Amino acid sequence: MPVLNLKSDLADADDLETLMAGIGRRARAAGRAMALAPAQTKDLGLRAIAEQIRASAPAILRENARDVSAAQAAGLTNAIIDRLTLDEGRVAAIAEAVEKVAGLADPVGRQLAAFERPNGLLIERISVPLGVVGVIFESRPNVTADAGALCLKAGNAAILRAGSDSHRTATAIAAAMSEGLARAGLPADAIQLVPTRDRAAVGLMLTGLGGCVDVIVPRGGRSLVERVQAEAKVPVFAHLDGICHVYVAEGADLGMARSLLLNSKMRRTGICGAAETLLVDAAVAETHLKPLVEALLESGCAVRGDAATQAADPRVSAATDADWRTEYLDAIISAKVVGGLDAAIAHIEANGSHHTDAIITDDTDAAARFLNEVDSAIVTHNASTQFADGGEFGFGAEIGIATGRMHARGPVGVEQLTTFKYRVHGSGQTRP
């Protein structure tokens, strides 16, 4: 597939290292100021950003038109071009999303725990910002504002590295954000967009820029996430795949199962929370398998199944071993009959990606076991896998979904963009 020109905008590697080091130092200083900013000031800054994005709409759309034209000339797919394209309505939605972040509760300064020791020490655990968040994303220019706003709300600075195809648009949005921050008396450098398309800049960000970057969040395809996870010298909040399962267990209502399966798979096939595998319990296969497969096929979804699923409908093609570990991101699903709850859990453990998995059943004991034993960031009972979203969780927005075990897991919203410190209050105690 043709790609956009990724040639460095800079003269040599030394220039790039100097540029990135300066961005890191300015972000660290801005992050310190943001960490100390009162909640009201941060919210004023976010509302000023939203106003400036609206005021800058003509400039943003002009730069977006240039990005879209270049993408079309490079032969990028219609799906990528659609993600890249903005219009007046989409720009307005970007501004509105920033305002919604301003309306969230401040995650900084909350008392997470408090206790008194036998020696009279009073100890508090208090939420504090992470510091500097590096966000590396591809073709969605709205990520500039979405991710930046979440970082700012949590008292962080952000270094944003846009994909080459959205670079001009992201630059225009980031400029509006910096201007809004300055109007509110906050450091404009709390939002910085890497001003080069050079992929070497990503490598420098992954080193942590000499201790100036505290965490990296990649937003993009598998190749980007694989590179970030392999090369990063700082913590990463990310997921590699969204291989999500819907398990129709014994005790499942057929009507509910049909509705939840179609929503989990077909509402939006290209998102990480879309179901990729259907598991049907052998105890209900005789009554549930055929109508569920027919519903998928009639909705335009191709089905790749095991022998039992192929026998249910001649339109089902044979599944290979690779299908059970494939994130299709398309109107395709693999389907299999399993011999009970233990077999379903074992299949998910062997083939899943620890993202989102669902059980459909009226058996509360079986549901409790599934929710307890399936080791995924999100597990649902009688609910669509496509609820794997920060907005649906009431987080207001998300910077991504994390499937790792350290710090953030599931939707990464403003609370997950904080860490904590301990405050210890004494009255002259010394340690014996």
Curated annotation (Swiss-Prot):
One Pfam family matching this protein: Aldedh
Localization terms from the record: Cytoplasm
Membrane spanning stretches: none
Keyword Oxidoreductase: yes
Record InterPro entries: Ald_DH/histidinol_DH (IPR016161), Ald_DH_C (IPR016163), Ald_DH_N (IPR016162), Aldehyde_DH_dom (IPR015590), G-glutamylP_reductase_CS (IPR020593), Glu-5-SA_DH (IPR012134), GPR_dom (IPR000965)
Record's GO cellular component terms: cytoplasm
Domain of life: Bacteria
Keywords for the protein's UniProt record, in alphabetical order: Amino-acid biosynthesis, Cytoplasm, NADP, Oxidoreductase, Proline biosynthesis
Gene3D superfamilies in the cross-refs: Aldehyde Dehydrogenase, Chain A, domain 1 (3.40.605.10), Aldehyde Dehydrogenase, Chain A, domain 2 (3.40.309.10)
GO molecular function: glutamate-5-semialdehyde dehydrogenase activity; NADP binding
Enzyme Commission code: 1.2.1.41
Pathway: Amino-acid biosynthesis; L-proline biosynthesis; L-glutamate 5-semialdehyde from L-glutamate: step 2/2
Its job: Catalyzes the NADPH-dependent reduction of L-glutamate 5-phosphate into L-glutamate 5-semialdehyde and phosphate. The product spontaneously undergoes cyclization to form 1-pyrroline-5-carboxylate.
Entry similarity comment: Belongs to the gamma-glutamyl phosphate reductase family.
Protein name: Gamma-glutamyl phosphate reductase
Organism field: Methylorubrum extorquens (strain PA1) (Methylobacterium extorquens)
